[in-house]
């Protein structure tokens, strides 16, 4: 019987691995969200889902839909997804500049109330439509990872103030403190940081260009 124990253990590990792979293959892991204003002054939400292919390449799939501040965007776009969308691995949330000027706390409040969302995720403002940024191709890594690395690299160099969801909320609720957010934009198809946005409470009030 002892000689069979190693074989049984190996079989259990193989079976567990197959189950985990099947579960991952049957869900869409959301890694980024973008919010834009339409010409009708409606909010259009975009979710980013990396699709990992068998040849180890990554295709970035986006799904868009009209979003209301008091409704969950993920629940809305679920109707357009082929597999269930899960929120636990979100890295970035991007707000178009026009929307940020109107106020974004209702969207951020929804994120902080979701127990599956970590407070280390990055929030930022975009000069270009967020749907264009999230749909972009930035090399052989996922779009969310590219944006995360872009921000963290510049924060380590101190070209950007350190900020994330946790820092933003602390600044927002602290009396006399103005939150700041990175501003990103596209130039000839390349994504970069263009400046820092200073907010009065949750509304973009002024910007500082990076040189």
Residue ranges and their predicted role:
Residues 2-9, 13, 17-211:
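Membrane-proximal alpha-helical signals and transmembrane carboxylates
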């Amino acid at each position: 019987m002892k000689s069979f124990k190693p074989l049984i253990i190996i079989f259990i590990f193989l079976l567990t691995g197959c189950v985990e792979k099947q579960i991952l293959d049957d869900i869409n892991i959301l890694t980024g969200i973008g919010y834009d204003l339409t010409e009708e002054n409606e909010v259009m939400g975009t979710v980013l889902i990396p699709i990992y292919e068998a040849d180890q390449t990554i295709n970035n799939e986006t799904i868009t839909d009209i979003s209301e501040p008091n409704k969950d965007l993920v629940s809305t776009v679920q109707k357009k997804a082929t597999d269930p969308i899960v929120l636990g691995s979100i890295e970035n949330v991007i707000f178009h500049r026009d929307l940020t000027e109107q106020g974004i706390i209702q969207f951020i409040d929804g994120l902080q109330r979701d127990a599956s969302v970590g407070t280390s995720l990055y929030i930022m403002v975009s000069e270009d439509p967020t749907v264009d940024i999230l749909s972009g191709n930035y090399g052989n890594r996922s779009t969310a990872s590219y944006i995360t690395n872009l921000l963290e690299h510049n924060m380590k160099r101190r070209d950007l103030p350190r900020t994330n969801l946790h820092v933003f909320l602390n600044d927002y609720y602290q009396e006399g403190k103005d939150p700041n957010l990175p501003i990103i934009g596209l130039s000839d198809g390349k994504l970069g940081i263009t400046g820092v946005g200073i907010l009065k409470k949750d509304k973009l009030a002024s910007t500082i260009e990076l040189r």
